[in-house]
């Protein structure tokens, strides 16, 4: 069993406990949370609660997460672009085209397979299919990920994500010309009822906030920096489509292919967090991958 501690904020006042926990960065489903509440594994301010409990600001919520079913993950030696590593955390620059963790039908060739060969220990809180994984980026998105090498680090990093103190900045190329230099997209994201493999903005979705800043404008495209306040599945891709500026090359949320680029033009370039052991803020920056830098240069040449 592993314990996760979460402090409720003012903006979460009066949310049901199951909705509150399902909206955190832990990728828990509401059904999963409801079962844990029923089993007495969710405690608020030291006492077990029922599923209809309404969150109050400052509530100290403790979730006891059961151990996952044991499954074997193959350790595969591979070249990893590691930016930082110590006894607690590892920061790796994931290439475009690599899946983060194994899943049914895709059990090898993932970042986790490579990490299992590189590290002797990784945290076990997220289960054996996702050891050490605190957050994810999509297969065709490149960039920085933080990995927990023990459960202490994992709990610290997850709590920082929940409390929105982790810096996550992405560089993206989007279709169209954004007229204003800065903006915030505050729109809940949930599973698309018509296509369960896609996400969409929906009233009953999870809270999602993205801030963006225009870096450069081209003839028919805009280069932007997007900063995540939350971390929903496909968040930047869904949010930019929602405001009318889908990512260039995005096969799922973009228009029909109008640009020569393999996958969405999105790179997780900046990652910052408080070190779990020392409390010191650390920040890392990964340059654009060659294919995305070339795309931007070509757009620049074309005006």
Curated annotation (Swiss-Prot):
Enzyme class of the recorded protein, top EC level: isomerase
Q: What is its EC number?
A: 5.4.99.-
What are the protein's UniProt keywords? Isomerase, RNA-binding
- Catalytic residues per the record? 138
Q: Which domain of life is it from?
A: Bacteria
UniProt GO molecular function: pseudouridine synthase activity; RNA binding; rRNA pseudouridine synthase activity
GO biological process terms on file: enzyme-directed rRNA pseudouridine synthesis
List, for all copies, the residue spans of the domain called S4 RNA-binding: 15-74
- Catalytic activity reported: a uridine in RNA = a pseudouridine in RNA
Pfam families named in the record: PseudoU_synth_2, S4
Q: Which family does it belong to?
A: Belongs to the pseudouridine synthase RluA family.
This one is known as Uncharacterized RNA pseudouridine synthase YlyB
Gene source species: Bacillus subtilis (strain 168)
Q: Which gene encodes it?
A: ylyB
